[in-house]
From Swiss-Prot:
The keyword Lipoprotein applies. It comes from Gallus gallus. It is a peripheral membrane protein. This is 55 kDa erythrocyte membrane protein. May play a role in the regulation of neutrophil polarization. Signal peptide: none annotated.
Amino acid sequence: MTLKSGRGGGGGSGSMRTALSDLYLEHLLQNRAKPEAIAQAPNAMTEDIYTNGSATLGSPSHSNGREVRKIRLVQFEKVTEEPMGITLKLNDKQSCMVARIFHGGMIHRQGSLHVGDEIIEINGQSVSNHSVDQLQKMLKETQGMVSIKVIPNQQSRLPALQMFMRAQFDYDPKKDNLIPCKEAGLKFQTGDVIQIINKDDSNWWQGRVEGSGTESAGLIPSPELQEWRVASVTQSSQSEAQSCSPFGKKKKYKDKYLAKHSSIFDQLDVVSYEEVVRLPAFKRKTLVLIGASGVGRSHIKNALLSNNPEKFMYPPPYTTRPQKKNEVDGKDYYFVSTEEMTRDISANEFLEFGSYQGNMFGTKFETVHKIHQQDKVAILDIEPQTLKIVRTAELSPFIVFIAPTDKAEESEALQQLRKDSESIRSRYAHYFDLSIVNNGVEESLKLLEEAFEQACSSPQWVPVSWVY
């Protein structure tokens, strides 16, 4: 499907988002009646019984004016070593409560217990005066017929979540000292799409990696917890760095400036997850090439333009430098006065701009829109700080990171290039749709073109902000 946007920043963004919203709504309507299959678990028998506070159990009609409590008797046979998939906690009254139910686990598949249920007995043994560890061990070691008495949580059950998040960091629960149970954690990598199953716990959500082939969920740090963790580490590192420096805090000057954002704001940006939705195939309008200086982006860009002039186009930059004899205004560059360029920068008409040898250079949103209006793909080779600006429904970019060769003879220059590339990758990898090791223009072109076509012809995960 080819989607077109109108002119101008605001109008283009709005119309493109509307088109993607319509596409998403159509997708939801077509798939709303497809139930998710869940692996079967041993059947559980439940029976509701009532008590008026005495030891006698019966029906609610025999309450004799006393407060009636409903107690549920849950019975099932446990014949394997599979964990039940629940965690317990003691509330303020020292009552044993179901704290968490793991999606895909035995209890979840049975539907026999719910978060907030109060457990009274396990196999006829009262849970009073037991620690959480003792109770968890009791559940783990039970075999054969299991009988649990609970006071059901009377709060309404919320419908299952339909939320998907793209991970913006790597996570290994075995290396996490904060997680309450390392074995229950979910390992994932940057770029993995995680279906969020439960987020009742403000610190630890439950999720599963989409496409992993398993129904079982694991614990993941919530966005709030992860952002707190990263901010704490960053603050600690900055404090240590300042205390070690005889000059205190140093200021860094950058010659590259970005419209609407600055490098200072970028440094304060803490990433965790990004909510995404799955859309049917649609055309990506912009191809963005990211990489360290000297990695070969220009060679790849020029080869794309030369091999596919009917498909790809590069937006001519604006500049305040004098026009040379062999240059055509509007083809090689747009030549403007310093006053005009300064005015347009103030009006946020540039997606990126900077200066070189006393002259200003920059790329306008308008020139990118003109390429889209010709039904062509705009190629941008920009600084990584600009990614958050171009990653919008308006531009619908496919972002490719170009990494240095891993086959060339080792040299000091190559070592520096790899160091610069790793610095970009570690900071901006959560934006990348594709990473390519540039072992040659021809090989890189083949990989890039195949991946771009695949992205435009198959369902895609996109930021939820592109749709709503």
